[in-house]
């Protein structure tokens, strides 16, 4: 049975810590649905200054975070929905199977979405989802964004920093640059509905109508400790 978590929190640092904790400290298969207040999240191997308009983010009080999985930079806000799958597997997984789960969900809503070579998801050639993944021992984590009603102006501003003179050289040597794509919101392609409606549909679909599992007190304490010791630390966020 899969443990299904519908997170009541909206803190990017808590959620990144929760993912790492649940991956490394548990043995349950987990599905988690979550959202964050405005945040920019870069991959573990990315160079922050090449991916984020830091001055704009700080001025607009947009959080800047680094996750422990790879992949490119993404923008989160309360119009964006995030899905996380954590499973124990005896062999190297094919991550496209996780992508297909999301495509099947979108198909259930009448959306003819397609997957891309970098495990992105597209509607009419415009990106609505990016994903990343990582392995830990016999455990796998796959997570993705779903742009439902995101502030796309803020997204473009956050993820388009001023080019630096040495940016191309440094990025190619030391870090993994994001591949830019034109984006759209899912809401433009479905009958009118709120992001809450969309979240409910997503949770019901992936949880197979199982009940919501809450974080335990012990988990919250451990996750918050990891949040404080790692994810909010400048040494981690600005490590490249």
Regions found by a protein language model. Give the residues of each.
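Long, positively charged amphipathic alpha-helical accessory segments at protein N-termini or as interdomain linkers
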Residues: 100-105, 109-112, 127-240
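Broad gene-expression machinery/nucleic-acid interaction feature
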Residues: 39, 80-82, 118, 127, ...
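Short, conserved charged micro-motifs
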Residues: 50-52, 90-96, 154-156, 194-197
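A short, structural micro-pattern
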Residues: 34-36, 77-79, 115, 138-140, ...
């Amino acid at each position: 049975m899969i443990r299904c978590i519908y997170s009541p929190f909206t803190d990017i640092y808590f959620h990144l810590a929760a993912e790492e904790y649940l991956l490394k400290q548990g043995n349950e298969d987990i599905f988690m649905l979550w959202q964050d207040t405005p945040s920019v999240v870069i991959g573990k191997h990315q160079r922050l200054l090449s991916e984020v308009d830091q001055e704009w983010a700080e001025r607009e009080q947009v959080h800047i975070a680094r996750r422990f999985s790879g992949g490119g930079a993404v923008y989160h806000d309360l119009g964006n929905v995030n899905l996380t799958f954590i499973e124990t597997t005896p062999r190297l997984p094919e991550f496209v199977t996780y992508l297909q789960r999301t495509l099947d969900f979108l198909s259930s809503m009448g959306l003819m979405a397609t997957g891309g070579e970098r495990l992105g998801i597209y509607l009419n050639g415009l990106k609505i989802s990016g994903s990343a993944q990582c392995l830990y021992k016999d455990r796998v984590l796959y997570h993705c964004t779903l742009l439902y009603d995101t502030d796309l102006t803020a997204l473009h501003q956050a993820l388009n920093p001023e080019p630096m003179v040495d940016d191309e050289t440094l990025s190619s040597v030391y870090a993994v640059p994001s591949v830019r794509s034109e984006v759209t919101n899912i809401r433009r392609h479905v009958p009118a509905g709120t992001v809450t409606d969309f979240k409910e549909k997503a949770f019901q679909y992936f949880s197979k109508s199982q009940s919501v599992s809450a974080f335990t007190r012990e988990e919250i304490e451990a996750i918050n400790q990891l949040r404080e010791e790692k994810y909010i630390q400048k040494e981690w966020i600005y490590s490249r």
